[in-house]
């Protein structure tokens, strides 16, 4: 294994040096596996491979990682206890929490996000699962790469996060050409659909807290890329944030105003017409866009129910899930709003929609909820 030596001038040179990744896990098997995956990537290097959170805290300054993959359950010092100490010792450190799919670990992962962790990833529970963990490998490498890319951009992006009131308009996109916006369709919205991935849990809680008047009168359906158990916990958090009922969608459940429906982990949430309304259909088919649940199945299936009466929001996340479904929503007469780059943890999904020219608005997260309230009240200005 090539373990990197810290280079303080890494970003001052003419080229960017490989991403430095610290792997912290008490399982030697998982540590070795993740380390080998990282070493196989041309743009990454293992900064350190450590057994406990205490080791990580003691060595983080010397190892100088860009990213830490941090297990939750470890001896001496567990991940949730090590997290604030690591962030205090290294500014802008990206920490990805790794845990098995238990309710306790899901709760801890959500707490870690509130304490400053950048993301989480579900970890295979046995060595037999690990040996064939292609999805785990794919997701981990992509998370490391995309989260680090955002942090490595000029600090000018950070200034755009300030929540000062600004006119409702498309936000300048620093690293891409400005998206071409469509005029808002005048179809009256009848349902709100939301898709999100990396950074989504925090963004969703901010969003639902500000759209109470919308939830009271219209159904809200959300697909967040997330595994089983985690979606159960997320629904509970969304209910508290919104002050309205929120739960995982149930097969053949009738969709009603006043409720938030969340796609359950491991199954796509689709919609089907029933009379004048809609029912939820849980789909155990193949992953779409490498995801299950995926956003596109929700978006496309909703058209059969509400046609042009759909308002879709695409929040922070990796990849392009939601873009194709958004295209079909727009073609049916609906509207799409995307989160802007500056306020996104990763501007993959919303960026794909914005660059495809299907958005009527590209907005900072803090401006999306007020805009939705106005749109559902009939104000399309």
From Swiss-Prot:
Chain positions covered by the region annotation Disordered: 154-176
Cited InterPro entries: CheB-like, CheB_C, CheY-like_superfamily, Sig_transdc_resp-reg_Me-estase, Sig_transdc_resp-reg_receiver
Residues forming the catalytic site: 197, 225, 321
Modified residues (4-aspartylphosphate): 71
Domain CheB-type methylesterase positions: 183-373
Top enzyme class: hydrolase
Superkingdom of origin organism: Bacteria
Statement: the UniProt record of this protein carries the keyword Phosphoprotein: yes
Keyword Hydrolase attached: yes
Gene Ontology MF: a single term: protein-glutamate methylesterase activity
UniProt GO cellular component terms: cytoplasm
Post-translational modification: Phosphorylated by CheA. Phosphorylation of the N-terminal regulatory domain activates the methylesterase activity.
Protein EC: 3.1.1.61, 3.5.1.44
GO biological-process terms attached to the record: chemotaxis
Summary of the function given for this chain in its UniProt record: Involved in chemotaxis. Part of a chemotaxis signal transduction system that modulates chemotaxis in response to various stimuli. Catalyzes the demethylation of specific methylglutamate residues introduced into the chemoreceptors (methyl-accepting chemotaxis proteins or MCP) by CheR. Also mediates the irreversible deamidation of specific glutamine residues to glutamic acid.
Family membership noted in the UniProt record: Belongs to the CheB family.
NCBIfam families (UniProt xref): PRK00742.1 (NF001965)
Record protein name field: Protein-glutamate methylesterase/protein-glutamine glutaminase
Source species: Nitrobacter hamburgensis (strain DSM 10229 / NCIMB 13809 / X14)
